[in-house]
Swiss-Prot record:
It catalyses: a lipid A disaccharide + ATP = a lipid IVA + ADP + H(+). It holds the Pfam family LpxK. The gene is lpxK. GO terms for biological process: lipid A biosynthetic process; lipopolysaccharide core region biosynthetic process. It is an enzyme of class 2 (transferase). Belongs to the LpxK family. PANTHER family: TETRAACYLDISACCHARIDE 4'-KINASE (PTHR42724), TETRAACYLDISACCHARIDE 4'-KINASE, MITOCHONDRIAL-RELATED (PTHR42724:SF1). InterPro entries: LpxK, P-loop_NTPase. ATP binds at residues 58-65. It comes from Chromobacterium violaceum (strain ATCC 12472 / DSM 30191 / JCM 1249 / CCUG 213 / NBRC 12614 / NCIMB 9131 / NCTC 9757 / MK). This is Tetraacyldisaccharide 4'-kinase. GO terms for cellular component: plasma membrane.
């Protein structure tokens, strides 16, 4: 973990003082931008179907993508046609682009590829309003749009805002960037519709009456990169030199999950979130290399050597929610729109 990230969760007095002016400037700019949309100085674009934003007020991996995948699964089970729009972080799409199974993660980003694999129409673009219109033009049967991230993208009008919080790390120092991990102050939570807490541990200063949902990430058995039906449990890795590789926002959670599964990992490799992997990133001396589903979609496109691919294993996770968030969303939208 970098020094600045350590400071976010274990503040150092001298660094707090040093970064205070930059934090103040960031706070001023963030507040001014939000007020510009709230007061009508800047206008938001509204789509013809309800929009639910799945976002966060802090940086780093909090579990938005597993949550979005869980909602896609639950909405599909209810017969609700849902589309997803995303910025496509890590991608370079210059205009709204629909994500397909053969899309290049360097163009559309890694998380959208994972979401598209779930069967939902996904469109990425810097302008989320344009992305939503592009999606609806191609998929006019979509009844609801989930915006994966985009809480601070106020140009997109939204019907519901759901914030995901990391239950173990909480809000860190509670300070704004670069002095803390927050994009917006904790008071922003008073304006959202609900929070989803991923895991447990931290005491979270949540506003009274704010609907709260608990999310648990449950790992499945590791499966081969090229064959999801070929699974291996902890015993299958016994006696082998195992490495774990992660290019996500909070890699420690992934490593801890492997340990909780009883998999002995000799080498842990952390890369920046949305890292563009190359074959040289795979440790040559490991018998097996376990990766996240998010990283697997990128590695599958850059690792072409058969022997190297055979050493790659994917740890899938599935989010479960309590109480039923999908049902709550539908009820809130019905109350708001009468449908």
């Amino acid at each position: 973990m970098r020094l600045i990230e350590q400071h976010w969760y274990r503040p150092r007095g001298w660094l707090t003082a040093l970064l205070a002016p930059l934090e103040g400037l960031f706070a001023l700019l963030a507040a001014a931008r939000r007020q510009a949309f709230r007061r009508g100085w800047k206008t938001s674009g509204r789509l013809p179907v309800p929009v639910v934003v799945i976002g966060n007020i802090n940086v780093g991996g909090v579990g938005k993508t597993p949550l979005t995948l869980a909602l896609l699964r639950d909405f599909a089970a209810r017969g609700v046609k849902v589309g997803v729009i995303s910025r496509g972080y890590g991608g370079k799409a210059p205009a709204p682009t629909e994500v397909g199974p053969d899309s290049d993660p360097a163009l559309v980003g890694d998380e959208p590829l994972l979401l598209a694999a779930a069967g939902a129409p996904v469109v990425v673009g810097r302008d989320r309003v344009a992305a939503g219109r592009h999606l609806l033009a191609r998929h006019p049967d979509v009844e609801l749009i989930l915006s994966d991230d985009g809480l601070q993208h106020y140009r997109l009008a939204r019907d519901l805002e759901i914030v995901v919080l990391d239950g173990s790390r909480g809000l860190g120092s509670g300070r704004l960037l670069p002095n803390g991990p927050l994009r917006e102050p904790p008071s922003r939570l008073a304006a959202v519709d609900a929070v989803v807490v991923n895991g447990e541990g931290a005491q979270l200063p949540l506003p009274d009456g704010l609907p709260r949902f608990a999310m648990t990430l449950r790992p499945g058995a590791c499966h081969a990169l090229d064959d999801a039906s070929r699974a291996r449990d902890a015993a299958g890795f016994a006696g082998r030199k195992v490495a774990a590789l992660a290019g996500i926002g909070h890699p420690e959670r992934f490593f801890d999950t492997l340990a909780g599964q009883g998999i002995a990992v000799e080498q842990r490799l952390s890369f920046p979130d949305h890292h563009a992997f190359v074959p040289g990133d795979i440790p040559a001396d490991a018998d097996a290399v376990i990766v996240t589903s998010k990283d697997a979609v990128k590695l599958a496109r850059v690792i072409h050597d058969a022997a190297q691919r055979a050493r790659l294993w994917v740890l899938p996770v599935q989010a479960t929610l309590a109480p039923d968030l999908c049902e709550w969303i539908l009820a809130r939208l019905k109350t708001k729109h009468g449908r």
